[in-house]
């Protein structure tokens, strides 16, 4: 059962929308803008990066979702970690993550990025990039398809739309 406040808000919204008005909250507008203008930065480490390139190509066209790949971490708000993360590469991943401006999100793509994958028991592999950076969305598969990546990005957009306020930090420790 919905709260009476939300029911009144819905009734008012319906009445005004019939007359050509739009009634919204600033949080909703900010969430909509953030979700529909993601600028991902690729951190392609292995074969999952090929699927990521396929998702950005003309057949799937991630640009239609408002996503534009950026070469610099200072210009991007989404990091897609695709592939096997080694112990030598982990400090570089953390450094790039720290250079990103807030709000920032991380998407872990593939079994290797999620938990080490096929190389889980190797001495040189980090068993999941979530040990180095906080991850918002996990995409399973070896390698995951371009459709799975786009589905994961759409789930991230839903998550971003649910956030409120100007500052986003779901990883606060108390």
From Swiss-Prot:
Its EC number is 7.1.1.-. Keywords: 4Fe-4S, Cell inner membrane, Cell membrane, Iron, Iron-sulfur, Membrane, Metal-binding, NAD, Quinone, Translocase, Transport, Ubiquinone. It is found in: Cell inner membrane. [4Fe-4S] cluster binds at residues 47-48, 112, 142. Binds 1 [4Fe-4S] cluster. GO terms for cellular component: plasma membrane; respiratory chain complex I. It is a peripheral membrane protein. Pfam families: Oxidored_q6. Its cofactor is [4Fe-4S] cluster. GO terms for molecular function: 4 iron, 4 sulfur cluster binding; iron ion binding; NADH dehydrogenase (ubiquinone) activity; NADH:ubiquinone reductase (non-electrogenic) activity; quinone binding. One of its GO terms (biological process) is electron transport coupled proton transport. It catalyses: a quinone + NADH + 5 H(+)(in) = a quinol + NAD(+) + 4 H(+)(out). NDH-1 shuttles electrons from NADH, via FMN and iron-sulfur (Fe-S) centers, to quinones in the respiratory chain. Couples the redox reaction to proton translocation (for every two electrons transferred, four hydrogen ions are translocated across the cytoplasmic membrane), and thus conserves the redox energy in a proton gradient. Belongs to the complex I 20 kDa subunit family. NDH-1 is composed of 14 different subunits. Subunits NuoB, C, D, E, F, and G constitute the peripheral sector of the complex. NCBIfam families: nuoB_fam (TIGR01957), PRK06411.1 (NF005012). This is NADH-quinone oxidoreductase subunit B.
């Amino acid at each position: 059962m919905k709260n009476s406040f939300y029911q009144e808000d819905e009734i008012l919204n319906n009445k005004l929308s019939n007359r050509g008005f739009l009634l919204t909250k600033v949080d909703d507008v900010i969430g909509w803008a953030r979700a529909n203008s993601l600028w991902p930065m690729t951190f392609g480490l292995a074969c999952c990066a090929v699927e990521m390139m396929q998702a950005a190509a003309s057949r799937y066209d991630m640009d239609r979702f408002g996503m534009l790949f950026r070469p610099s971490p200072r210009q991007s708000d989404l990091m897609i970690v695709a592939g096997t993360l080694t112990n030598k590469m982990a400090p570089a991943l953390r450094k790039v993550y720290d250079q990103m401006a807030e709000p920032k999100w991380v998407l872990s793509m593939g079994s290797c990025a999620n938990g080490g994958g096929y190389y889980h028991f190797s001495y040189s592999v980090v068993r999941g990039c979530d040990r180095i950076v906080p991850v918002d969305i996990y995409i399973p598969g070896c390698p995951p398809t371009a459709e799975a990546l786009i589905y994961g990005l759409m789930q991230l957009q839903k998550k971003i739309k649910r956030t409120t306020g100007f500052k986003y930090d779901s990883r606060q420790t108390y």
